[in-house]
Amino acid sequence: SRLPSRMLSRSPGWLRRSAPAAVALLAGLATYAAFPPVNLWWSALIGVGVFMLLIRGRRFWAGTGLGLLYGFGLFTPLLHFTMVGMGNPIGWIALTLFESLYLAVLGGAWSLVSRLPLLQGTARQSRFTRRVPAGAAGVLFFALLWSGIEELRSVWPLGGFPFGRLAFA
């Protein structure tokens, strides 16, 4: 965990285990706030940045689970209009779950990629990577993963569902 050790020793076990889940949900909500009707564009920077830092270096299944929760925090309010249009919550819940699965894949992938030696600054440096700090390389790799997942979400399945791309915020 990333909290100071004296804080962890005083906090109950359930709080230590549930804090990352709450942070993932709140990061998703912060990202949602960048979209209309809230339109706080800068909250996307906070939400996505917290998501990236929260999952960095975690185990695969932890990253996957936190990605799923981040997706719930983002897509539950963002796709609420589908319940209004359908008159029942079934489509809203199904679409929220399906779209959140993409971010679960992103969370799992980022948890693996973020542990690469190149991104931790421990890899043997080539002529190209010598000039790129490990932190900047991490942001670049995360942006590539995020863009890839958004593109996949936009084209698959059945022509995709591009609603909720970060560029729309």
Language-model segments: what does each one mean?
Residues R6-A169:
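Membrane-embedded alpha-helical bundles of multi-pass enzymes
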Residues S1-S5:
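Extreme N-terminal basic, low-complexity initiation segments
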